[in-house]
């Protein structure tokens, strides 16, 4: 059975993983916002399964809806925000040589995490 990890913005669960990939289901509550962050060892690909997202990658803002997807290159500053009135569901795919939850550098976080 997969375990759900609760976060201040919602939750996630790992759907599948291998040596060089990980797939997660992320749920972001309305108004929820992940930290502005980057990763040294992995790139990410996000698929919007349902809801409306504002995604910042570098200096660009992207508004995505159900069935849209976006690639986040390794080392890029990025942020995910639920701009809809329902839960945002994102399928997040990680790719890289070191897939660790601690591979995160936070630049800004509304929940005051480091």
Regions found by a protein language model. Name each.
Residues 59-77:
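Short acidic-glycine-tyrosine-enriched beta hairpin
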Residues 29, 41, 48, 73-75, ...:
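A short, compositionally biased micro-patch
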Residues 2-6, 79-114:
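Double-stranded beta-helix
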Residues 2-43:
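A short glycine-rich, His/Asp/Glu-containing loop-to-beta-strand
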């Amino acid at each position: 059975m997969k375990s759900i990890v609760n976060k201040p913005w919602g939750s996630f669960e790992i759907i599948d993983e291998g040596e060089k990939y990980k797939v997660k289901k992320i749920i972001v509550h309305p108004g929820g916002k992940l930290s502005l962050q980057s990763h040294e060892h992995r790139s990410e690909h996000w698929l919007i399964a349902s809801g409306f997202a504002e995604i910042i990658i570098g200096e660009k803002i992207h508004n995505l809806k159900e069935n849209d997807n976006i690639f986040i290159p390794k080392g890029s500053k990025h942020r995910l925000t639920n701009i809809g009135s329902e839960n945002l569901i994102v399928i997040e795919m990680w790719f890289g040589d070191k897939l660790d939850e601690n591979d995160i550098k936070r630049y800004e976080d509304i929940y005051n995490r480091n």
